[in-house]
Design a protein with these regions (language model features):
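Terminal targeting signals and extreme-terminal segments of soluble enzymes
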Residues: 1-167
């Protein structure tokens, strides 16, 4: 897996589009996280790689954008918030959609997390994401979160509703 420092940040990718889209503006200017996709991002369009599309797999590095000096419970809360920013991407990828698909709407139906170790949101974490299923307007995203040293710190699952206007 490429080191996060070698990858382009979501902030850099979205900066040119910040004036055209509220979504792009959020990632370029307001996201509290430094997000770097190993698997090509679907922020700007659907995935053209059929292998990634078919599997729904995705790898993403993430950490706080800046230094956070708060109690452990807040580091965990920030990890939960951060995962929510990328959790549905594998579901959309598998469905052949992207975050920028015109008229798309999606919402979390259920979200669960399991903690195995303390989290330092100031350090890079690798989100190893997958989607076992995406069909009939619903999808299930699952992820394991690892430290840069390969320790599992958390696992999560999120079910979502996805709607795309009929063409």
């Amino acid at each position: 897996v490429p080191a996060p420092e070698t990858l382009t940040s979501a902030k850099e990718l979205m900066e040119p589009y910040a004036d055209k889209s509220p979504f792009a503006k959020f990632y370029a200017k307001k996201s509290p996280f430094d997000i770097r996709h190993v698997t090509p991002t679907i922020m700007l369009g659907a995935d053209k790689d059929s292998a990634a599309h078919d599997s729904g797999k995705q790898l993403v590095w993430m950490k706080a954008d800046g230094v956070v000096d708060v109690p452990q419970v807040m580091h965990r809360a920030m990890l939960a918030l951060g995962c929510d920013q990328v959790m549905m991407e594998p579901v959309l990828r598998r469905a052949g959609l992207s975050i920028s698909t015109p008229g798309i709407s999606y919402a979390s139906i259920d979200h669960s997390m399991w903690w195995y170790r303390d989290v330092d949101i100031n350090q890079w974490h690798l989100y190893v994401q997958d989607t076992p299923t995406a069909a009939h307007g619903r999808g299930l995203g699952v992820a394991k979160v690892y430290t840069q040293d390969g320790e599992l710190v958390a696992a999560m699952a999120q079910e979502a509703m996805i709607r795309v206007p009929q063409q």
